[in-house]
Amino acid sequence: MPYQYPALTPEQKKELSDIAHRIVAPGKGILAADESTGSIAKRLQSIGTENTEENRRFYRQLLLTADDRVNPCIVGVILFHETLYQKADDGRPFPQVIKSKGGVVGIKVDKGVVPLAGTNGETTTQGLDGLSERCAQYKKDGADFAKWRCVLKIGEHTPSALAIMENANVLARYASICQQNGIVPIAEPEILPDGDHDLKRCQYVTEKVLAAVYKALSDHHIYLEGTLLKPNMVTPGHACTQKFSHEEIAMATVTALRRTVPPAVTGITFLSGGQSEEEASINLNAINKCPLLKPWALTFSYGRALQASALKAWGGKKENLKAAQEEYVKRALANSLACQGKYTPSGQAGAAASESLFVSNHAY
């Protein structure tokens, strides 16, 4: 076995570990506001609003300037490249706004999925070229963590061994480059909820994918204490006719994680994967109440499940700003409780909060 050549100094390791711990402190989680220009277009279109740079800026500002009740709930905020360089009405750059509320700035660094030729519609993720230079610049511009999304699909013959291995290696290479630049990498191997598979099949695939990811991270000498994982919860496929309880989903999810994710990993920040806002909170709560030993923080990194009601309430109208922020605060508070296993659904969730946010073959 070759000798280990140290990739990071003790100081670098401490910085990475400290950032990761801040993001997943008890009761805290991440707002994923890193939709690409194409993805945010779909959100704005759903409320009849034009996809202009100013509308995108105003909407992100609405989320970032919500009142101080969100401060103990949302610490990490993942931004898209454009948003990192936008400013609030008062002239402050968005990273400054986030930091003034005690938050940590994150940046989406992947460049989207591309087809893996010779597979049944499977993909890998591009964006490694020039990543080191971009990370160095992002660090200077105030970002302390990053996100990279890979996508896998459950089908009769998918995910293939090739897709699993390729995506695991891409995530590991990305993680290595981030850590060299003082940025905490969030690895996101998303298994899409598309399909009619049951809970057991999703659990099996999730275990195989995560095992491959952590083997690759080990091969690439990643410092696990300075990383976070952003996985899907283990849920049945969207077209599965059998219904499963929140407790069954929690047990399957925690079991899969316990079998594959080393305890050295600081935290697990779940994606919401098209669940309704309310469902995402209830399942997160059930996961935290699951009666198995859980060595990592288990919290949220939600996009649609923090924003859907707020987006509807805003409706593209400036005069609805406060109403929209109120909806966002509600979801932030709900998820802050859920990641501590303390959330009790009131049964009064608005229509928007109970609405499925599933999008077939979701591109980000």
UniProtKB/Swiss-Prot annotation:
Phosphothreonine: modified positions: 9
GO BP terms, alphabetized: fructose 1,6-bisphosphate metabolic process; glycolytic process; protein homotetramerization
PTM annotation (N6-(2-hydroxyisobutyryl)lysine): residues: 99, 147
GO cellular component, one term: I band
Cross-link (Glycyl lysine isopeptide (Lys-Gly) (interchain with G-Cter in SUMO2)): 42
Subunit structure, interactors included: Homotetramer. Interacts with SNX9 and WAS. Interacts with FBP2; the interaction blocks FBP2 inhibition by physiological concentrations of AMP and reduces inhibition by Ca(2+).
Stated role: Catalyzes the reversible conversion of beta-D-fructose 1,6-bisphosphate (FBP) into two triose phosphate and plays a key role in glycolysis and gluconeogenesis. In addition, may also function as scaffolding protein.
Protein's name in the database: Fructose-bisphosphate aldolase A
Species of origin: Pan troglodytes (Chimpanzee)
Gene it is expressed from: ALDOA
